[in-house]
Every structure is written in structure tokens, then in C-alpha cells.
């Protein structure tokens, strides 16, 4: 087993997750089996109770783990399925050690950060690195470990010490450290500054770890003189300094790393028997990145949500839309609309904001309402759903988005004017959405219906079933506490809102479709978590096809994308790579 530790310096959010994912992608393209571990040095047990504004979206895994969004990057880039134990937090480590102490496992010894916490970290990494994450269920050969935060953070010190010890246990030929640092370029001088990187590397060395590769992040390509300066002052060879400047898309990052000889370096440094040139998989990434940069035709989508001030809150939704747009040769123009701005109360409070929100909604070729929690902005989401339904604009509702589509239909079609979800109005006389029987109030963490669940199609006359290649059932990831009221299902279906997908027992409604509408779909699950760059999520793909006016042709052609029936349609806008 080979271990690659990715650390960060200067500032957080410098792009360690994308760098780690890209390194994994390159090594996987060389025929190696790769897994990934993300370490978050916070005391929370998991990410499930975080505000999206604190840490971005909560990514859900097949086993129901609620984890950091970087694990979503790993899954998308590497096309693997990780587990909740691939996300290590300080809270998990301390909980494990304290439980052992309570059981008497330490035989009365004084339990300390060194050696007990550091040993627990190393043990966790060793065990989890062996867990298969590919479809063939074979043990991984490479484990990429990302340490969250920056060098010098007090929260990360136990982990740094653990890996200082770990490098000797693993042996030099099995362990290397990649340090990601920022090279700022102040506008006042226009000069790229190396001092922050020098200080960061010095701090890392002072803690017992020496970087094997220094990945320098910058806004613009770094000059050769800067590379030589970093090489000299950070005591590494020039080829050990890698540049990653801002690029048009994250798909370009693995190509950027590969072009700077990173495969040859890993082959020598970790004694890996691989070819210097990657397999066709990385060439597919290059073609995808090239095609992304050539796209001219745009499809405008309105994302009507609650957490629109920070795009990280909807990372997986954005990526799923981007994957689908790329598959049909369109550039995605995603407009984030705060749902509260669409509400009538906003018209009196801030008319400019209200009219701007509605102007953007009116320009959208498709409307998406994602998952969420809480009352704020729900009426604005319902307004957007009404707009999409009445004007036959393609609509996709995810989790809460589907539930609110049901509420909107109950109010405006079934004439239950006070219909609502019991989440927002526990005393409503017409509960269109109710809390699930197995949900018990109390602890917030881990109390939802989480993880991969089976959804069975109840009819062959379903556009979503066709998008899923006419499978009898699908398995997608869930994260919710509420469900559609099964007592109202018959009334909904009589008026044209069909529940085409249900759980195994036929009691829980999972997929809705509206008759007579180009694409009005709601899903209780989160298909964005399983979308991949080269395998877009079917509900998102159908949504983008409908928004671009290509859905009917796609369905008539047996739901197959080919150069003849998709890319060549816009040969004047984008070259075909096939």
C-alpha cells in the first residue's frame, strides 16, 4: 500500500480537494486502484448537523454517512463509492479513544494525545485504506489522504504528529507528502510572492514532515524564476515544484499535473511499476476538458434555493447539471435565486431585489428546486414551482423540491388552499407532506432516512424510467425526514400528478411526474450524489435535455447519446470529439 498525504498552507480553501482528486485520477488512469480519505480536524462527529454556510453542502454516501463535500470530489473524479469511515474527524477519533478508556482497554494508563490519539489516527488510516471502493471489490493499492485546514492550525496538530510517526512505519518508499500552497500576486506590484510558501514549508518541516512535491496555486501561470526561487528556498528540486493556476474548469487540473511529469515522479518516488504515459482514461478527461472550453451554446437554469449566497452549498447539484450540460454539448449558465426574494412580502420590503429575482426566473429555460430544511423561503419556492407548472417550463424538484411540488399541486389543483408540510405547519388540516413514522424527535445527527435505497418503478409509461434505461428499479441516495402523505396519493393521480416511483412496499412516494408537461419531475432522493463527469445522473440529464429542447429526440432514439443525434446538432458551435 502506498500513501500520499496532501497538506495545505497559507490559507484554507486553496484547492487541496481538487488536487487530491486529480492525483487520484492520474494514478487510476495508470491502472492502479485508488482510495481516498479526508481528515477534518473539527470535533463534530460528522457533517450532518452543519449549516451549509459553515461548510458547504453535506455529501451523503451509500452507507448513509454525512460527510464533507470533498468526498464528493473524490467519488466524481475517481468513480468510486466511499464509506463514512473515509471521513475522519477529531470527534470520531476522540469518541473512539474515550470509549476504549471507559471499557478499560488502556489498563489504567493515563490517556494522552501522544500516543493514544495519534495511534488511533494511524490505526484508522491503515484499516480504512484497505477497504475496497471500486466495483470489482479489490483492495486499493494507493490511498490519497487529504488533511483539512492549514499547517499551524491547533486543531490539526494531533494529525500532523500522527503522520510524522506514520511515515516511518510505512517506510519512505510507501509514503510521500504533497504540500499545496498559495502564491499570491498583489495587484499593487503584480509580482508573484513566494514568502508565504517558504514560511508554510518551514512550518511543516518544523513539525516533522518534509514535502516531496510543492503544488503552487495561483491566479495566473507562475513564472520560471518563481519556480526556481521556491526550489532553492524550500530545499526541493525544480521538478518537485508543480504549478496549478486557475483554469477554465476543474477537468483541466489532472491534465495540468500530468503535463508537469507527476506520473514519472510518482513512479520513481514510490517505486510504482507504471508506464510514464497514462491510459486512455486520462485522454478522455483531456477530450472532455477541451470540449468544455469549446462550447458556445448556453442553457440557462434557475436554481431556486435557500442557501444561494455560497455556491458550495449546492456543489453536487451544480456538478450534476454541468455533467449533463457537457454531455449534450451545452454550456451551463446557472442562476442562483434566493427563494425568499420571490415572495410577495419581498415586493414591499425590497422591490428592486424582488423584481430582479423574478426577471432572472423568467429568463430561465429550466427551473430546479433543490433539497433543504426550514421554513424560510418555502413560499418563494412554491411560487417558482407554480410558474414552471403553468408555463410548461422544465422543472426538477429534489427532496424538499419534490415535496413542495406536491404541496403546490394540492393548493392550486386540488384546491386545498391551506395544504402544507407538517415540517412547516404541524397543525395544517391538509398535510400533503408528513413526517415519517420512524423519525423520532430528539438528537439531530443521523436521525434521517439516509443512504442508498431502492426505488421501484410502478409503470412503464414514465420518462424517468426511460432515462434510467428502462430498469425496473434504481438505487439512489436519500436524506430526508418527511414524505408525501400516502392518503392523498389517489387524489393527486386522478388530477394528473403521477407517482411513478415508490419504495419496495409501495408506501413511500419517491418519483413524481406531471401529465401533459414537457418535463415536470420530482424525486425524493438526491441523484446528484451519484452523477459522474462521464456518466451524468439520468434525472438531471433529462432535465437539461428538456431545457435545451432535445428530450423528445433523445427518448425517440432509445435514450442514447451519440455524435449523430446530439453533438453534430451543434457542429457550428462545438466540435465533436467522437
Curated annotation (Swiss-Prot):
Q: What EC number(s) has UniProt assigned to this enzyme?
A: 6.3.4.2
Ranges where the Glutamine amidotransferase type-1 domain occurs: 300-553
Q: Highest taxon of the source?
A: Eukaryota
Q: Indicate the enzyme's highest-level EC class.
A: ligase
Q: Which reaction does it catalyse?
A: UTP + L-glutamine + ATP + H2O = CTP + L-glutamate + ADP + phosphate + 2 H(+)
UniProt keywords, alphabetically? ATP-binding, Glutamine amidotransferase, Ligase, Nucleotide-binding, Pyrimidine biosynthesis
Q: What is the protein's known function?
A: Catalyzes the ATP-dependent amination of UTP to CTP with either L-glutamine or ammonia as the source of nitrogen. Constitutes the rate-limiting enzyme in the synthesis of cytosine nucleotides.
Per its record, how is this protein called by name?
A: CTP synthase 2
Please tell me the species this chain comes from.
Xenopus laevis
